[in-house]
């Protein structure tokens, strides 16, 4: 399992990527692979177990252990991430580009580890980029030879 305190800017310490805040320890984000980045983050499918009673009331019967995130990260640039030999099931640590927020004044607390230096307060809300320990679920890349672009997508779920 990767070390969560490690700065996962790139697997090769000689070529850190100064072009993005995205870090993927275990895969790496080389220079020229991170333009056009997008990240979605949401609950895993098993997190939602809602059922209706015989009277029609909606009840949440989900197990708190399933309160985990899934994420999809995609980009289009001139180079791909280091996907070679990185198969589904590999544990990785993602310093997200997507942000989460909570409201301490309402008794809410931060639910995930924050990427160091990413926390900020906006009015009553605290916003941060989470650091997630995940397993690769799937990835793909496509090459546009004539356009000299490589598109890629990484799907991962929190362990």
Give residue spans per PLM region.
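Extracellular/virion structural assembly segments
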Residues: 1-159
């Amino acid at each position: 399992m990767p070390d969560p305190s490690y700065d996962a800017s790139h697997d090769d310490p000689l070529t850190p990527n100064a072009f993005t805040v995205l870090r993927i320890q275990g895969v790496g984000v080389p220079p020229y692979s991170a333009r056009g980045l997008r990240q979605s983050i949401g609950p895993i499918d098993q997190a939602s177990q809602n059922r209706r009673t015989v009277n029609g009331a909606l009840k949440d019967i989900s197990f708190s252990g399933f309160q985990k995130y899934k994420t999809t990260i995609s980009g289009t640039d001139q180079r791909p991430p280091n996907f070679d030999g990185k198969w589904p099931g590999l544990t990785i640590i993602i310093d997200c580009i997507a942000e989460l927020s909570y409201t301490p004044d309402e008794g809410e607390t931060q639910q995930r580890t924050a990427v160091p230096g990413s926390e900020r307060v906006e009015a009553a809300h605290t916003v941060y980029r989470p650091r997630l320990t995940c397993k690769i679920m799937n990835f793909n890349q496509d090459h546009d030879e004539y356009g000299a672009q490589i598109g890629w997508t990484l799907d991962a779920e929190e362990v």
